[in-house]
């Protein structure tokens, strides 16, 4: 078993005692850091950065050089899986990700391969191995994937969407086609996450960014059901240590009880959910991650500290809290404010772990 100098993130996910509340930030390797922008310029474009193991490792480590974060997260993108299925991912300036061949019907789904994680997605595994080597056991490495539903939204819509009318049309007019796609994605994501774990990821997270656009019943059928399948198929132990899994549905605060039944170790919360209420509802079943509004990092330092104190008090005493933002850090946040946030979590949380 690889010795970890700082394992408080893994311990908190498993609701074990820690000295202070662990903290990391979604998108902590990103455009708010000038050093990230420099490395990205060196790579040429976003996907070239993802596909170069040394550069992906460099940007993964950049935030850890600045801040005493308790975890590193693999630098990659949720759309690596659909890209490996041959949909032709490209990025349009100001438009975000697009696909040249969106999925329109059951026949399109039938043609999609289930990618081999060590072949078509080998560059991700190389990045995981490189990052693990360079971390030298300082902090754990988080691997991740998008959820089947969230990946399907991009694949069917052909890119980002505001109203999700194309995929909802498929969901209501041709549910069989959508279920076939989600099933294939669940198998692909299970293989992909297990390969990340074998390559060295010490925890994994499933990002269900668009689950919150569904009705409760549709969320159960088209999103949660497939995340549950993935959780059931994941390697839960590797290198002599439990591998915790976190589910995060943005806008999913009303479904926490159902999410906690999947067998995951932790639930990510966005900033619209009250953490005290969330803890009351899930009890000791799962750990909770979150959940400061990322926009709070625009506030003066004293206000950031006040918000950190309020969220810590909301969760209260005891184990099972990983502090994070409620979604990714914004690209124009002053890096010093992120530093205030991280330092405040450690300093102000000590009293809750005595």
Swiss-Prot record:
Name this polypeptide is given: Uroporphyrinogen decarboxylase
EC number: 4.1.1.37
GO cellular component: cytosol
NCBIfam families: hemE (TIGR01464)
Alphabetical keyword list: Cytoplasm, Decarboxylase, Lyase, Porphyrin biosynthesis
Residues that hold substrate according to the record: 27-31, 46, 77, 154, 209, 327
SUPFAM superfamilies: UROD/MetE-like
Pathway annotation: Porphyrin-containing compound metabolism; protoporphyrin-IX biosynthesis; coproporphyrinogen-III from 5-aminolevulinate: step 4/4
Site (Transition state stabilizer): 77
EC class (word): lyase
Function: Catalyzes the decarboxylation of four acetate groups of uroporphyrinogen-III to yield coproporphyrinogen-III.
Reaction it catalyzes: uroporphyrinogen III + 4 H(+) = coproporphyrinogen III + 4 CO2
InterPro entries documented for this protein: UROD/MetE-like_sf, Uroporphyrinogen_deCO2ase_HemE, Uroporphyrinogen_deCOase
Protein's UniProt keywords contain tRNA processing: no
One Pfam assignment: URO-D
Compartments where located: Cytoplasm
Subunit structure: Homodimer.
GO biological process, alphabetically ordered: protoporphyrinogen IX biosynthetic process from glutamate
């Amino acid at each position: 078993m690889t010795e970890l100098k700082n394992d408080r993130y893994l311990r908190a996910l498993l609701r074990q005692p820690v000295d202070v509340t662990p903290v990391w930030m979604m998108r902590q390797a990103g455009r708010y850091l000038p050093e990230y922008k420099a490395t990205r310029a060196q790579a040429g474009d976003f996907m070239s950065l993802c596909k170069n193991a040394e550069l992906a490792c460099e940007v993964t480590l950049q935030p850890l050089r600045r801040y005493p974060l308790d975890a590193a997260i693999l630098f990659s993108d949720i759309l690596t899986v659909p890209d490996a299925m041959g949909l032709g991912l490209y990025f349009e300036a100001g438009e975000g990700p697009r696909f040249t061949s969106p999925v329109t019907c059951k026949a399109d789904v039938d043609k999609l391969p289930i990618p081999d994680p060590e072949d078509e997605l080998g560059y991700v595994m190389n990045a995981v191995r490189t990052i693990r080597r360079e971390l030298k056991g300082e902090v754990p490495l988080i691997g991740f994937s998008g959820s089947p539903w969230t990946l399907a939204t991009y694949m069917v819509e052909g890119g980002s969407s505001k109203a999700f009318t194309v995929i909802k049309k498929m969901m209501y007019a041709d549910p069989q086609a959508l279920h076939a796609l989600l099933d294939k994605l669940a198998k692909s994501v299970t293989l992909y996450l297990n390969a990340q774990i074998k390559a060295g990821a010490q925890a994994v997270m499933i990002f269900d960014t668009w689950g919150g656009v569904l009705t409760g019943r549709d969320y159960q059928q088209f999103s949660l059901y497939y995340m549950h399948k993935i959780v059931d198929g994941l390697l839960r132990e590797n290198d002599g240590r439990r591998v915790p899994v976190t589910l995060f549905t943005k806008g999913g605060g009303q479904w926490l009880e159902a999410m906690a039944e999947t067998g995951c170790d932790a639930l990510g919360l966005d900033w619209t959910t009250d953490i005290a209420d969330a803890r009351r509802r899930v009890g000791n079943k799962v750990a909770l991650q979150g959940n400061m509004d990322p926009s709070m990092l625009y506030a003066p330092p004293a206000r950031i500290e006040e918000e950190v104190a309020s969220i810590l008090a909301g969760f209260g005493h005891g184990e099972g809290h990983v502090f994070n933002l409620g979604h990714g850090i914004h690209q124009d946040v002053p890096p010093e404010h992120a530093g205030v946030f991280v330092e405040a979590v450690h300093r102000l949380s000590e009293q809750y772990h005595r």
